[in-house]
Amino acid sequence: MKSFFSFCVIAAVLAGAAPSVLAVTANAPTAAECAAPATQKRMNECAYEDFLAATASYAESHKAVASKLPGKQRELFLRSQKAWMAYRTAACDFESSGVQGGSAQGMVKWQCAARITRARVVELKAMGNCPEGDLACVRLKK
């Protein structure tokens, strides 16, 4: 079920859904519950909610960058983002493999995905701040 929901979140990101739409989940734990989760199930849920928050931030940054790229560059950017998502999934599958089948697997996987997603947001935001002389930095339209 979570794999299907992840697919839906990714599809929504690529379709440009509003971050607030992505953050809505049924029975989401509260911030207080996540500050001191009492069970592994709650830790898994909190890690998943953190991933959704990171995904919402990614969606916002992704949309901002894509909207400022001309045709061919935009196509290349979108292709790179699909490849990045595949990388993130594979990296987190690997990272969580040490606890595969255990009750903490979901938590480890969602924490990994949130961490990698936040790192990508930093990279996307940097695209708007190219230092003078950096020819490898993609300059966005204003």
Model-derived segments and their meaning:
Residues 1-5:
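Positively charged n-region of N-terminal signal peptides that target proteins for export
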